Amino acid sequence: MPWVSLYPVALFDRTKAPLTGTKRYVAHFSPETSRPPVRFFWSMTLYDNDGFLVDNEFDRYLVNDRSKPKYNADGSLDIYIQPDKPANPAQARNWLPSPPATSATRGFRLITRLYGLSDKGIKGVVDGTGWHGPSLLPCAPDGSTTEGVACAS
């Protein structure tokens, strides 16, 4: 059986608003979906609307299973997407720098790369009967989300 790759793209957050540098986000994987069904590896990367990597002063361009992200006690996984580095070291480990608010008009997209999906795995991702990507939750000014997931501090 062949193993293939799939690259789901997120252009909008959970509220269907376009991704922008004026907001902070949490990409929340539930305990059931925190580990994508891949044989090889997965990664998450931000690109601007022209298709280029989102430049940042930290030279940090992805979070993946090889970067050993910090999972929550319940098995879920939160990836923090924001321009500023989280003060909490565990959150900083799961941080993906987004464009600063000054470049908000350009927006960005989140690409999740899944390497080594089986035919069954691809079908489940594509038709919605299997693994699905994270909820991309916008952070409120007080650091909360509508689904009770905490944003980075």
In which residue ranges do the predicted regions lie?
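A compositional/structural signature for long, glycine/proline-rich flexible linkers
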Residues: M1-S153
